[in-house]
């Protein structure tokens, strides 16, 4: 059985490393990108099984734009997306669209507890 490949798209290297340190010891392969454009390139190159995606990166709602672009591509629209953000604690919270506006498979607020992250990743990969 091959390892599931997880793409983490976040401009915070500390968060990316924390996710890597949580997932890799549990049998996952982790690749990363620092913004939406780089993330889309990694989706094409790496064919991840799951994308963990921050909302706000190089621009406000950069992650939402990436998720929309993934949904527009038939080869990528079936890849589950777990959205993570600290947006609930910022002035941008009012800009966050409803679930009807974007297609994501799960949402977690930062900071994310390792146990919760592992549970959500496993659930999304085995749905």
Which positions does each model-derived feature cover?
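Non-catalytic signal-transmission and effector/linker regions of two-component phosphorelay proteins
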Residues: 1-7, 113-127
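Short acidic/polar segment at the start of the alpha1 helix of CheY-like receiver
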Residues: 12-16, 114
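Charged docking surfaces used in two-component/phosphorelay signaling
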Residues: 17-25
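Helix N-cap/capping motif at the beta->alpha junctions
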Residues: 32-41, 62-63
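Short amphipathic alpha-helix used as the core "switch/output" element in two-component signaling
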Residues: 41, 64-77
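Active-site beta3 strand of CheY-like receiver
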Residues: 46-53, 57, 81
């Amino acid at each position: 059985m091959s390892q599931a490949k997880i793409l983490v798209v976040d401009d915070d290297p500390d968060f990316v490393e924390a996710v890597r340190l949580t997932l890799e010891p549990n049998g996952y392969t982790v690749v990363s990108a620092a913004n939406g454009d780089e993330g889309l390139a990694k989706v094409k190159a790496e064919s991840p099984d799951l994308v963990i995606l921050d909302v706000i990166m190089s621009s406000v709602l950069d992650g939402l734009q990436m998720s929309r672009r993934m949904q527009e591509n038939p080869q990528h629209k079936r890849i589950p997306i777990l959205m993570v953000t600290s947006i609930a604690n910022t002035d941008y919270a009012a800009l966050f669209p409803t679930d009807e506006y974007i297609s994501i498979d799960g949402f977690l607020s930062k900071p994310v507890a390792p146990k919760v992250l592992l549970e959500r990743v496993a659930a999304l990969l085995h749905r």
